[in-house]
Amino acid sequence: MKKILSFLIAGIMACSAAGCSQKNANPISLPEESTIQSIDITVGEKTEKYSDCEWISQCISSMNNAQATAKESVQDIPQVDEYIKIDINTEGAKSTLFVYLEKNDYYIEQPYQGIYKTDSAFYQTITGNH
Protein backbone atom coordinates (compact mmCIF):
# COMPACT_ATOMS: atom_id res chain seq x y z
CA MET A 1 0.00 0.00 0.00
CA LYS A 2 2.84 2.40 0.89
CA LYS A 3 4.50 1.61 -2.43
CA ILE A 4 1.33 2.47 -4.39
CA LEU A 5 0.86 5.66 -2.38
CA SER A 6 4.49 6.65 -3.05
CA PHE A 7 4.05 6.10 -6.82
CA LEU A 8 0.78 8.03 -6.75
CA ILE A 9 2.37 10.99 -4.97
CA ALA A 10 5.39 10.91 -7.30
CA GLY A 11 3.06 10.83 -10.31
CA ILE A 12 1.04 13.78 -9.06
CA MET A 13 4.21 15.76 -8.38
CA ALA A 14 5.57 14.99 -11.86
CA CYS A 15 2.30 16.03 -13.52
CA SER A 16 2.18 19.21 -11.47
CA ALA A 17 5.76 20.09 -12.36
CA ALA A 18 5.13 19.48 -16.04
CA GLY A 19 1.97 21.55 -15.99
CA CYS A 20 3.63 24.42 -14.18
CA SER A 21 6.63 24.68 -16.46
CA GLN A 22 6.48 27.68 -18.72
CA LYS A 23 7.44 27.58 -22.37
CA ASN A 24 8.91 30.67 -23.98
CA ALA A 25 7.17 32.26 -26.94
CA ASN A 26 7.93 31.18 -30.48
CA PRO A 27 10.60 33.30 -32.18
CA ILE A 28 9.40 36.69 -33.36
CA SER A 29 8.10 36.45 -36.93
CA LEU A 30 9.10 39.38 -39.13
CA PRO A 31 9.07 39.88 -42.90
CA GLU A 32 12.34 39.56 -44.79
CA GLU A 33 14.12 42.90 -44.49
CA SER A 34 14.53 43.20 -48.28
CA THR A 35 10.73 43.09 -48.74
CA ILE A 36 9.96 45.90 -46.28
CA GLN A 37 8.84 49.12 -47.95
CA SER A 38 8.26 51.18 -44.81
CA ILE A 39 7.58 51.03 -41.09
CA ASP A 40 4.83 53.13 -39.51
CA ILE A 41 5.22 54.04 -35.83
CA THR A 42 2.06 55.23 -34.09
CA VAL A 43 2.32 56.91 -30.70
CA GLY A 44 -1.10 58.03 -29.50
CA GLU A 45 -2.74 59.75 -32.46
CA LYS A 46 0.52 60.59 -34.26
CA THR A 47 1.95 58.29 -36.96
CA GLU A 48 5.43 58.59 -38.46
CA LYS A 49 6.39 56.70 -41.64
CA TYR A 50 9.99 55.53 -42.01
CA SER A 51 11.32 54.31 -45.35
CA ASP A 52 15.06 54.87 -44.82
CA CYS A 53 16.77 51.50 -45.40
CA GLU A 54 19.34 52.06 -42.65
CA TRP A 55 16.68 52.93 -40.06
CA ILE A 56 14.57 49.93 -41.11
CA SER A 57 17.61 47.65 -40.84
CA GLN A 58 18.41 48.91 -37.34
CA CYS A 59 14.78 48.53 -36.25
CA ILE A 60 14.43 44.98 -37.61
CA SER A 61 17.76 43.96 -36.08
CA SER A 62 16.66 45.23 -32.67
CA MET A 63 13.35 43.38 -32.91
CA ASN A 64 15.09 40.16 -33.93
CA ASN A 65 17.37 40.49 -30.89
CA ALA A 66 14.44 40.71 -28.46
CA GLN A 67 14.29 37.82 -25.98
CA ALA A 68 11.26 35.53 -25.95
CA THR A 69 9.35 35.42 -22.66
CA ALA A 70 6.89 32.92 -21.21
CA LYS A 71 4.13 35.55 -21.40
CA GLU A 72 1.39 34.80 -23.91
CA SER A 73 -0.18 37.18 -26.39
CA VAL A 74 -3.87 36.31 -26.50
CA GLN A 75 -5.42 39.59 -27.68
CA ASP A 76 -5.30 41.78 -30.79
CA ILE A 77 -3.73 44.57 -28.72
CA PRO A 78 -1.69 44.51 -25.49
CA GLN A 79 -3.54 44.66 -22.20
CA VAL A 80 -1.73 47.81 -21.05
CA ASP A 81 -2.86 51.44 -20.95
CA GLU A 82 -0.17 52.87 -23.23
CA TYR A 83 1.59 51.24 -26.15
CA ILE A 84 3.28 52.09 -29.43
CA LYS A 85 1.97 50.45 -32.59
CA ILE A 86 4.45 49.30 -35.24
CA ASP A 87 3.19 48.47 -38.74
CA ILE A 88 5.77 46.81 -40.98
CA ASN A 89 4.62 47.37 -44.56
CA THR A 90 5.56 45.07 -47.43
CA GLU A 91 4.02 44.86 -50.87
CA GLY A 92 0.45 43.72 -50.26
CA ALA A 93 0.87 42.89 -46.56
CA LYS A 94 1.29 44.47 -43.15
CA SER A 95 2.68 43.00 -39.92
CA THR A 96 1.63 44.70 -36.69
CA LEU A 97 3.51 44.66 -33.41
CA PHE A 98 3.27 46.69 -30.23
CA VAL A 99 5.89 48.06 -27.86
CA TYR A 100 5.24 49.05 -24.27
CA LEU A 101 6.80 49.65 -20.89
CA GLU A 102 5.63 47.50 -17.98
CA LYS A 103 7.21 47.47 -14.52
CA ASN A 104 10.41 49.13 -15.81
CA ASP A 105 10.84 46.54 -18.58
CA TYR A 106 10.31 47.09 -22.31
CA TYR A 107 8.35 44.57 -24.35
CA ILE A 108 7.48 43.87 -27.98
CA GLU A 109 4.18 42.05 -28.41
CA GLN A 110 3.29 40.29 -31.62
CA PRO A 111 -0.41 39.40 -31.39
CA TYR A 112 -0.99 35.66 -30.93
CA GLN A 113 2.72 34.97 -31.55
CA GLY A 114 4.40 36.02 -28.32
CA ILE A 115 5.79 38.70 -26.02
CA TYR A 116 9.48 39.57 -26.20
CA LYS A 117 11.68 41.58 -23.86
CA THR A 118 13.61 44.40 -25.52
CA ASP A 119 15.72 47.28 -24.25
CA SER A 120 15.35 51.00 -23.71
CA ALA A 121 17.58 51.74 -26.74
CA PHE A 122 15.02 50.16 -29.08
CA TYR A 123 12.21 52.04 -27.34
CA GLN A 124 14.10 55.31 -27.76
CA THR A 125 14.79 54.55 -31.44
CA ILE A 126 11.14 54.11 -32.29
CA THR A 127 9.96 57.07 -30.24
CA GLY A 128 12.67 59.36 -31.60
CA ASN A 129 14.07 60.05 -28.11
CA HIS A 130 17.77 59.48 -28.74
Predicted regions and their residues:
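Function-determining sites in protein domains
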Residues: 4-7, 20-130
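Repetitive helical segments and hydrophobic/amphipathic motifs
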Residues: 11-12
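C-terminal motif of bacterial Sec signal peptides marking the signal peptidase cleavage site
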Residues: 15-19
